[in-house]
Amino acid sequence: MAESKVVVPESVLKKIKRQEEWALAKKDEAVAAKKKSVEARKLIFKRAEQYAKEYAEKDNELIRLKREAKLKGGFYVDPEAKLLFIIRIRGINAIDPKTKKILQLLRLRQIFNGVFLKVNKATVNMLRRVEPYVTYGYPNLKSVKELIYKRGYGKLNHQRIALTDNSIVDQALGKHGIICVEDLIHEIMTVGPHFKEANNFLWPFQLKAPLGGLKKKRNHYVEGGDAGNRENFINELVRRMN
């Protein structure tokens, strides 16, 4: 007796074919994703090396200029700062509506919130208005790095996301050529062409109360208090609050 031939319905054959095609596509996708990941890691490493070299060259140039000025019997004057870090040091008691509005515009809604700010006429005018409620100064590379690595959160799809992975930065800022945390640090530190986008991506930093406390929050820094411009000494305060 001849064996009966099993006829597989066409719909089943089509389904099997679709599954095979899907599996092949997923495999190709995985290979492409792995290749892209390897290339991205190489690029990130290369950029990190490039930035380290750039920062070192800048430091060496600064040392050279200071030595040169000293040899000539003068002193070196730092170029005008482009970047500020502002920390809110007072609450809402007895605060007038205009000052409150400016603090909100600066994204300093809570005490010990901190934000980066580009120096220009508009920001300087705003800072003058809210000076009794904030302290600020010129952050160095160490401060910018430590703030972003230790307390950095980004805004992605209206969510506050910890910067635990370069892919978070890439998703939000990749279209601006900022694909990793080191790119983000460089854009902030150098006040680059996409500083606004990079800074808006960063959630305001929530710092802790400073070790040793604050002296006199109502008095200006130059009067022995805490408010206002403390120039390079902001970095010492960042260490105490980070």
UniProtKB/Swiss-Prot annotation:
Any single biological process term in GO: maturation of LSU-rRNA from tricistronic rRNA transcript (SSU-rRNA, 5.8S rRNA, LSU-rRNA)
Family matches, as Pfam families: Ribosomal_L30, Ribosomal_L30_N
A molecular function GO annotation: structural constituent of ribosome
InterPro entries given in the database record: Ribo_uL30_ferredoxin-like_sf (IPR036919), Ribosomal_uL30 (IPR039699), Ribosomal_uL30_CS (IPR018038), Ribosomal_uL30_euk (IPR005998), Ribosomal_uL30_euk_arc (IPR035808), Ribosomal_uL30_ferredoxin-like (IPR016082), Ribosomal_uL30_N_euk (IPR012988)
CC per GO annotation: ribonucleoprotein complex; ribosome
CDD domains to which the protein is assigned, alphabetical: Ribosomal_L7_archeal_euk (cd01657)
This protein's record includes keyword Ribonucleoprotein: yes
UniProt keyword annotations, A-Z: Ribonucleoprotein, Ribosomal protein
Domain of life: Eukaryota
Entry's family note: Belongs to the universal ribosomal protein uL30 family.
Annotated NCBIfam families: uL30_euk (TIGR01310)
Protein name: Large ribosomal subunit protein uL30x
